[in-house]
Design a protein with these regions (language model features):
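Generic alpha-helix initiation/capping and coil-helix boundary signal
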Residues: 7-10, 128
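Short, Lys/Arg-enriched N-terminal segments with co-localized hydrophobic residues
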Residues: 9-21
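Glycine-rich, acidic/polar active-site loops that bind/position phosphate-bearing ligands
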Residues: 20-269
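Cationic, low-complexity basic patches in intrinsically disordered or flexible, solvent-exposed regions
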Residues: 4
Length: 269
């Protein structure tokens, strides 16, 4: 029987957790590219601070050998990786992570890659995906559990205006949200109807106080397209546009990939 370690889950059951898997073999990718007329392959990986990076190659140039042997890149130009004298690094694709980008004008297949040393093929110690893989392997080695499920409670703000500047003589930031309580006295086109969210009064109000229902619905649709299983979406407590969209927990590596997908979709929707 599989032993489970569940973290970050307050009201979810462990049953039914499975990763959205698009491909398991290289030939499946090649066939999909031809059948779906994919124009580009977006190669993605994560830097040490946790920011996803990418570059794009024409799908016509993708050979099956690349999906097995990987791609070379300059690791010295990526934060936290290597120095110039040891810049060569190799990216190895995780075919199970693939999804079609919902935002690109040209049909693009995204594949998430892990990083290895090009000379030894050993996992790169500062690749966040490799750190996650090592953590999962260590958990299994302890006998505490075979599988660890991670559930992220993903929350974010939607602002109408974000400004900041840092200069030698001047530093500031300014945020604004049309629905926020500090705009009750603001003159607005067509008149200010007063439907503003009070301080810490944003939890679960219906429209017109909640002005983001349609946006959350669109975000939820896009998240489903890229493979996440959605569970609920709502306005959060914060007056200035705080939102929450919950998606199903997953194993550590898959949960980390899901969070990268989540951030990409939310910021681009």
């Amino acid at each position: 029987m599989e032993k489970l370690l569940v973290l970050g889950l307050s009201f979810l059951e462990v049953t039914g957790a499975e990763r959205f898997v698009m491909f398991t073999q290289a030939q499946e990718v090649i066939d999909f590219i031809a059948q779906e007329e994919i124009a580009y392959i977006d190669v993605r990986f994560c830097d040490l601070p946790g920011v996803q990076q990418h570059f794009t190659i024409p799908a016509s140039e993708l050979e099956a050998s690349v999906l097995k042997d990987g791609l070379m890149f300059d690791g010295s130009s990526v934060r936290g990786f290597t120095q110039i004298h040891e810049s060569d690094m190799k990216l190895i694709p995780d075919l199970s992570s693939a999804f079609v980008d919902p935002f690109r004008a040209n049909k693009t297949l995204v594949i998430i890659f892990s990083i290895v040393d090009p000379f030894t093929d050993e996992p790169f110690s500062r690749d966040p995906r490799q750190v996650a893989a090592k953590a999962e392997a260590y958990l299994r080695s302890t006998g505490i559990a075979d599988t660890c499920y991670i559930g992220a409670e993903a929350e974010f703000f939607v602002f109408n205006d974000v400004r900041y500047q840092v200069s030698p003589q001047h530093t500031f930031y300014a945020l604004d949200s049309d629905e926020a309580y500090w705009n009750t006295g603001r003159s607005e086109a067509g008149g200010n109807l007063g439907y503003k969210v009070p301080v810490k009064g944003g939890y679960f109000p219906v429209s017109p106080a909640d002005d983001f229902t349609d946006l959350r619905d669109e975000m939820a649709n896009l998240l489903t397209e890229v493979g996440l299983t959605l569970e609920r979406a709502h306005h959060e407590v914060g007056s200035g546009g705080q939102q929450e969209i919950n998606y199903r927990f997953n194993t550590l590596m898959a949960a980390a990939d899901d969070m990268m997908k989540f951030k990409y979709v939310i910021k681009n929707a």
